[in-house]
């Protein structure tokens, strides 16, 4: 077995070109056996900032007599040699070591990538949090040797996790990462080879299938249908459940009698029975959740009618569905059906996941997220994003490519192509049959904006955390786009040699006649050119917006809060704003021409979609 060196550095800052190393810690190990350690402070030849001293505990006096980095390099080079280097966010450490001429060709391993994949539901992936989660006997202290020891311990624990993975999933992760360098490839190859001494045969089997995809789809059943003759609630009878000596006090030991809760409960019961609107303010400690859940549940059961509850925060949504509603079920002792429904982007799409696997990952972010999916789905029964940690905008961009947020996939298409096993379809089925349905403000308002085409029919609505409704409405009814989003979209679109357009060309070669293929190739080349032109003109557009905002600040520095400007008629006459309009006209012109080319490509795909190839339908949906 080859030894590995876990390395951690403390530095004067984050940029290796402008900052330097102040401490080096390294641990050489083989399996779980520590072979040697290396530790030294480094004289940076400059002052250490108070921030770094507070973070690391390393001050100027401590490094004043320490050796310079040039004196340390020979010993560190001899300690590491050509062994693989392990780190947590290892690119950071290696970038500083490369800057002083060290270890430019060493293989690198990253415990961040390992943890992100093998612990898909971990709340945080920083070194300190992982050390606590995995019960590492050392603490991450922002001192180099301590953190190197924790990194080695995290590696050892995570490698044990890898050895416990199903062999077909390990094989699939190794196959998918075959042409992409990333920080955990060494670990999965090592684990696979240890479990299977035969040569790797990269199966394209359904390694991702887990409980949710193996269980039969839910049976189609009639949606909830309200009674015509509504049965009113007795407000005092409903609130008696929350009185001293009531059912709640007998079941739950933490019962506390709250007069305000009783009053709110009775008022909501009367509101439901009499059919009027209610605006109520409940202070902290009122117990408002139970005050509205109990009458809502009883009303929905008596009248076979749905009550929709909208919240602003995920925390409250989780509290309602995982704690409060189960308590209500126990309290009223009935067959209350309750579920939570989220936006499409919160659910995995197995069809898009399979298409993503077929094209193979093209970056470390893509292989990391895809590997995380395979491991998560071996256990998940929901396909719900809330179960896992998608960390940062780059991972979020990958998730967007495999989520159910696909306008081209309708319920009918989902049932036809996937047999109703899709997480979003299951969630909608549960919502259709629920007496109490929990959503968030964003989904509620999206349903309003689309003419009630998202949520099942409802007549009764309770808006909790209503003080956030105005800002949620602003967000729901507005449009937002950023320069990085445009650049990611253009990259995904690609051209003749990469991305979506390249996949369209590749698939079409097996179907189209030479003349039609040549025409498609020409259109794709035109689309590639227009995409490049739009990308450049959109950059100029955002630059002009930046110049306009800077002009509006009139020399003032940008503060902590974002800068807001209302575009009123007087603003539109200013030269900086005229530059914005001119740059947008150019970007818009390129975008329109790009759309025209994409429409022509889509028309070609439509003509050949009757060949029965699902990949054509996937490409049409993506484009």
Per-region residue spans from a language model:
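Conserved non-catalytic scaffold segment of RNase H-like nuclease domains
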Residues: 1-107, 113, 120-142
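Conserved pre-motif I regulatory segment
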Residues: 232-280
């Amino acid at each position: 077995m080859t030894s590995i060196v876990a390395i951690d550095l403390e530095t004067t800052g984050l940029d290796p070109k402008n900052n330097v190393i102040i401490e080096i810690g390294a641990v050489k190990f083989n399996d779980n056996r520590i072979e040697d350690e290396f530790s030294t402070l480094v004289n940076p030849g400059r002052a250490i900032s108070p921030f770094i001293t507070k973070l690391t505990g390393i001050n100027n006096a401590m490094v004043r007599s320490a050796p310079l980095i040039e004196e340390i390099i020979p010993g560190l080079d001899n300690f590491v040699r050509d062994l693989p280097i392990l780190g947590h966010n290892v690119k950071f450490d290696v970038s500083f070591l490369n800057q002083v001429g060290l270890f430019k060709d060493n293989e690198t391993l990253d415990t961040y990538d390992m943890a992100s994949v093998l612990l898909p539901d971990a709340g945080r992936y920083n070194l300190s949090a992982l050390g606590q989660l995995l019960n590492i006997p050392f603490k991450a202290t922002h001192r180099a040797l301590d953190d190197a020891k924790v990194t080695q311990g995290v590696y050892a624990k995570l490698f044990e996790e890898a050895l416990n993975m199903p062999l077909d999933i390990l094989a699939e992760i190794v196959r998918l990462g075959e042409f992409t360098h990333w920080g955990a490839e060494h670990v999965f190859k090592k684990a696979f080879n240890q479990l299977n001494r035969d040569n790797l045969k990269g199966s394209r089997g359904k390694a991702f299938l887990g409980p949710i995809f193996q269980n039969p789809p839910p049976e189609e059943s009639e949606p909830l249908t309200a009674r015509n003759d509504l049965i009113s609630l007795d407000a005092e009878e409903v609130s008696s459940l929350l009185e001293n000596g009531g059912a709640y006090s007998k079941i739950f030991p933490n019962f506390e009698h709250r007069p305000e809760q009783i009053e709110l409960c009775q008022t909501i019961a009367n509101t439901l029975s009499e059919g009027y609107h209610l605006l109520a303010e409940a202070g902290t400690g009122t117990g408002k959740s139970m005050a509205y859940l109990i009458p809502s549940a009883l009303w929905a059961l008596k009248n076979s009618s749905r009550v929709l509850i909208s919240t602003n925060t995920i925390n409250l949504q989780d509290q309602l569905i995982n704690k409060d509603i189960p308590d209500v079920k126990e309290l009223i002792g009935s067959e209350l059906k309750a579920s939570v429904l989220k936006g499409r982007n919160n659910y995995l799409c197995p069809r898009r996941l399979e298409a993503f696997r077929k094209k193979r990952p093209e970056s470390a972010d893509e292989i990391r997220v895809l590997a995380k999916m395979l491991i998560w789905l071996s256990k998940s029964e929901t396909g719900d994003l809330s179960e896992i940690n998608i960390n940062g905008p780059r991972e979020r961009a990958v998730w967007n490519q495999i989520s159910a947020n696909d306008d081209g996939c309708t319920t009918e298409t989902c049932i036809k192509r996937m047999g109703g096993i899709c997480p979003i379809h299951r969630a909608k089925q549960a919502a259709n049959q629920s007496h109490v349905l929990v959503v968030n403000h964003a989904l509620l308002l999206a349903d309003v904006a689309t003419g009630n085409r998202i949520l099942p029919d409802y007549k009764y609505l309770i808006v909790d955390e209503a003080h956030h409704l105005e800002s949620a409405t602003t967000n729901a009814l507005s449009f937002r786009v950023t320069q990085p989003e445009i650049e990611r979209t253009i990259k995904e679109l690609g051209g003749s040699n990469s991305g979506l357009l390249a996949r369209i060309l590749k698939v079409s070669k097996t179907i189209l006649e030479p003349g039609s293929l040549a025409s498609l190739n020409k259109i794709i080349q035109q689309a590639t050119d227009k995409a490049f032109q739009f990308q450049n003109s959109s950059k100029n557009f955002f630059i002009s917006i930046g110049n306009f905002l800077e002009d509006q600040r009139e020399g003032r520095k940008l503060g902590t809060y974002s800068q807001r400007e209302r575009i009123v008629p007087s603003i539109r006459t200013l030269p900086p704003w005229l530059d914005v309009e001119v740059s947008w006209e150019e970007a818009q012109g390129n975008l329109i021409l790009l759309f025209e080319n994409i429409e022509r490509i889509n028309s070609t795909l439509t003509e050949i979609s009757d060949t029965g190839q699902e990949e054509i339908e996937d490409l049409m949906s993506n484009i």
